[in-house]
Amino acid sequence: ETVDTARELFTDKGCRVTFVTSLLTPDVPEDTVETLAITKDDAWVVRTPLVERKPTPNGQGDTFSSVALGTYLKTKSAKDALEAAVNTLYGLVSHMDSGALDLPLIDEQRQILSPEHPFEAVRC
């Protein structure tokens, strides 16, 4: 249902790739979160453990968007873009100090270049 709605709202109107982040639905276990990449012809999902931070870290959307866009422009693959963005963000968030407000972009830049958690996208 989420895939069909996103495809109708965005992809059918000219967007080549639409990402849906922080997807929590009744069929997703409580301790996990899903992220989708949707194109005209395909849809991919990555499921990761849920890492909750209070307050929500600054820069997550910017980081996800920049990694996803950069990877997509380089590879033309929605699957690759999804995996790179999710793996980078998961690595950064999971290495945050308790109570920190900002992503550790400098201290954990290795998570951008070579994320240590290689979650794989599966077709949905």
Where are these regions (language model features)?
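Domain-wide signal for the mature, well-folded portions of proteins, strongly enriched
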Residues: E1, W44-V45, T75, M96
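Conserved phosphate/ATP/ADP-binding segment of small-molecule kinases
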Residues: E1-A43, R53
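Short, basic, helix/turn surface patches
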Residues: D4, T48-L50, E108
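Alpha-helical scaffold segments in soluble metabolic enzymes
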Residues: T5-L9, V67, T71, D80, ...
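Glycine-centered flexibility sites
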Residues: G14, S22-L23, G59-G61, T75, ...
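Short pre-catalytic strand/loop immediately N-terminal to key active-site residues, enriched for Gly-Thr
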Residues: W44-N58
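Short, small-residue alpha-helix embedded
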Residues: K54-A78, L82
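Charged C-terminal helix
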Residues: K79-C124
